[in-house]
């Protein structure tokens, strides 16, 4: 990971690499399975006390699997943005958005987006009460995909997402 700060702006890049090789026998036949996953991320964010803070990032993942006669390769491209803003010293607005494109070597399998937002109110720093309304899954995304691998299998999983909903929260500090 490499990180650099320029005044109130912080930039970072990071890479995660994982290589696994499994040598096994299945019904007296040798099977050599290799998995190589790579995740690269670039991020740019601000760090202000009173101005809105923004976090922009881009994540690119490659999941390369070779199970003897079968091989698969999955890609995930995911730009995202987060905003955190203090408004009139009493309201805090937070929102986050991410776009995900999950594909294999031939085509895109699924694209999905997530967008969440919240608005909270606290009269002042000494106030015991805080009120918040939160909206989750504003774009009403229905499912997301992930790929995983082990020593004997590669799987591509589709998970179903809870529909859009709103919550209201009251918080009291003792």
Protein language model regions, located:
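Exposed, low-structure sequence patches enriched in small/polar residues
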Residues: 1-174
């Amino acid at each position: 990971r490499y990180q650099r700060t320029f005044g109130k702006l912080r930039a970072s890049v990071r890479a995660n690499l994982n290589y696994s090789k499994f040598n096994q026998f299945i019904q007296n036949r040798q099977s050599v399975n290799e998995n190589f996953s790579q995740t690269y991320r670039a991020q740019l964010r601000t760090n202000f006390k009173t101005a809105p803070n923004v976090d922009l990032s881009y994540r690119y993942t490659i999941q390369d699997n070779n199970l003897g006669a079968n091989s698969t390769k999955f890609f995930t491209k995911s730009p995202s943005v987060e905003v955190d803003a203090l408004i009139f010293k009493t309201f805090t607005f937070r929102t986050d958005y991410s776009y995900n494109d999950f594909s294999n070597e031939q085509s895109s399998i699924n694209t999905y987006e997530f967008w969440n937002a919240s608005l909270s109110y606290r009269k002042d720093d000494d106030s015991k009460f805080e009120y918040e309304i939160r909206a989750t899954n504003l774009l009403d995304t229905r499912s997301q995909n992930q790929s995983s691998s082990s020593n004997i299998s590669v799987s591509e999983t589709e998970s179903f997402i809870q529909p859009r909903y709103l919550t209201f929260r009251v918080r009291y500090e003792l």
